[in-house]
């Protein structure tokens, strides 16, 4: 949440919406990474992992009961997918004979382990697979089962099946039982039905509600941090993203705030192209002649931008350089436009994020965003959607609104102390750092949450004396928090 705004613009949203925010829930297949983020956001809102597992397992058992089976075989791994199977076994114990095979190659997740222990007190035959002989001894269970449930490997599984899962899948596929997969089929398992939890993870999947709060999905949260790509062992310099900041002239500090924020946001290399020369040992500065960015800098800026993963334009730029920005923007793969770059006609790169406040949104769209949050979300989505898939909008306000023309999400982190000048530059640089290594919509959502959360931390120390640079210093703490 960033409250930096123009005089006379509308920055206070009315959270009592005339429409339903449910309309902004996504539909269709969700990626495993996005689903993990939603799960973590639900936990941050007070729904425990054990509650989610209980709901998932109970729903899975309900699907199995539709077949009125006499014998059910449940195949489990050691992760949370296996935990869903343990819960399902408990709910099925009073309606049919239940056998459960599980393989644990290391530590189980705590929730899965707790539900496995509970089965000691249930009418469920539990068989642990420790070696090939254990599976051979259990082979007859496959042919006797009316329904076989696959709860072996979930959304976090790696490609390439290993033993004993390989043999468990082979045995299951060799018999005529109805086969049901929990959340996502284990590789090679020929499921008759796949029951996704909360949202489908594959096109052929059904899905059931497991009680995840609406806000865990349509609002940003700490779970979104799980989507930020981790640096791989052995990565070379620059693998974390190369960001170019183009700005400065009338306002000398703005591009440097954006650049330092990009570094704290994880970018490996940050270069500042500006007429305002300041010395920072962590930054590469490409000084531009004159007092403002002008047409004589066009070729140099295009060259610098083409060698960057993401370009951030507008911080401290002034109004006299807009034509230059419009001319160079199409040469850039990914661009974040902020502040003085947000004028009509709007410049576009190949992929573009803009970070306007309400006044800037009016400048480029012709109208102020509505106060009502639902209408505000629709307004931002419609504007983003008018750009043929090239634009993601991060509208700053008491509640930030983010849309790529299809999806819409909201962010409510932040502090009233963030009305200080420069906070928008910090957000722009952070957005550029994330955008350099992930999709536009995810980068915009996550940067809004991080920036607001860092602002809350800094405001706790400095209250109304907060500086934009104080937010920058808190970014790593937020990005590295335990989720």
Which residues make up each language-model segment?
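Small-residue (G/A/S/T)-rich helix-start motifs and N-terminal tracts that mark the onset
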Residues: 2-104, 109, 113, 147, ...
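Generic hydrophobic/packing signal
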Residues: 76, 102, 120-123, 152-156
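A structured beta-alpha segment of the ubiquitous adenosine-cofactor-binding alpha/beta core
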Residues: 119-141, 296-304, 317
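Short amphipathic alpha-helices and their capping/turn segments at secondary-structure boundaries
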Residues: 132-143, 339-348
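Short, conserved clusters of charged catalytic residues that mark active-site
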Residues: 133, 163-167, 323, 375-378
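Internal gly/pro-rich beta-alpha loop/helix module
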Residues: 139, 146-147, 151-220
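Short beta-strand elements of ligand-binding domains
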Residues: 181, 337-339
């Amino acid at each position: 949440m960033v409250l930096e705004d123009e005089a006379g613009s509308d920055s206070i949203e009315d959270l009592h919406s005339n429409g339903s925010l449910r309309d902004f829930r996504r539909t269709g297949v969700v990626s495993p990474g996005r689903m993990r983020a939603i799960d973590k956001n639900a936990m941050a809102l007070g729904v425990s992992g054990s509650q989610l597992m209980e709901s998932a397992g109970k729903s899975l058992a309900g699907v199995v009961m539709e077949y009125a089976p006499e014998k059910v075989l449940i195949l489990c791994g050691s992760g949370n997918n296996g935990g869903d199977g343990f819960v399902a076994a408990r709910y099925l114990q009073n309606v049919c004979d239940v056998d459960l095979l599980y393989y644990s190659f290391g530590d189980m997740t705590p929730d899965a382990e707790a539900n496995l222990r509970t089965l000691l007190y249930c009418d469920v035959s539990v068989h642990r697979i420790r070696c090939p002989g254990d599976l051979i001894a259990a082979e007859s269970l496959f042919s006797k089962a009316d329904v076989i449930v696959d709860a072996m490997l979930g959304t976090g599984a790696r490609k390439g099946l290993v033993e004993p899962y390989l043999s468990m899948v082979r045995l299951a596929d060799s018999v005529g039982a109805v086969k049901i997969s929990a959340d996502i089929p284990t590789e090679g398992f020929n499921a008759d039905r796949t029951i996704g939890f909360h949202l489908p993870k594959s096109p052929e999947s059904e899905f059931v509600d497991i009680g995840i709060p609406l806000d865990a999905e349509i609002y940003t949260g700490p779970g979104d941090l799980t989507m930020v790509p981790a640096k791989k062992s052995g990565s070379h310099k620059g693998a974390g993203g190369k960001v170019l900041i183009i700005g400065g002239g009338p306002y000398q500090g703005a591009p440097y705030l954006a650049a330092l924020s990009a570094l704290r946001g994880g970018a490996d290399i940050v270069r500042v192209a500006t007429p305002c020369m300041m010395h920072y040992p962590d930054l590469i500065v490409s000084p531009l002649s004159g007092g403002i960015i002008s047409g004589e800098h066009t070729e140099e800026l295009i060259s610098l931008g083409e060698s960057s993963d993401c370009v951030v334009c507008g911080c401290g730029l002034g109004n006299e350089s807009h034509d230059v920005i419009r001319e160079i923007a199409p040469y850039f793969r990914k661009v974040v436009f902020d502040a003085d770059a947000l004028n009509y006609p709007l410049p576009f790169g190949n992929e573009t994020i803009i970070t306007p406040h309400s006044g800037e949104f009016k400048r480029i769209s012709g109208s102020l965003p509505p106060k009502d949050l639902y209408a505000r979300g629709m307004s931002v989505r419609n504007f983003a959607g008018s750009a043929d898939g090239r634009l993601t909008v991060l509208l700053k306000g008491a509640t930030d609104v983010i849309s790529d023309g299809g999806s819409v999400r909201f962010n409510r982190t932040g502090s009233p102390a963030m009305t200080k000048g420069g906070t928008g530059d910090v957000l722009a640089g952070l957005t550029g750092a994330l955008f350099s290594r992930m999709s536009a919509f995810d980068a915009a959502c996550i940067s809004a949450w991080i920036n607001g959360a860092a602002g809350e931390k800094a405001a706790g120390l400095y209250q109304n004396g907060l500086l934009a640079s104080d937010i920058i210093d808190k970014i790593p703490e937020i990005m590295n928090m335990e989720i």
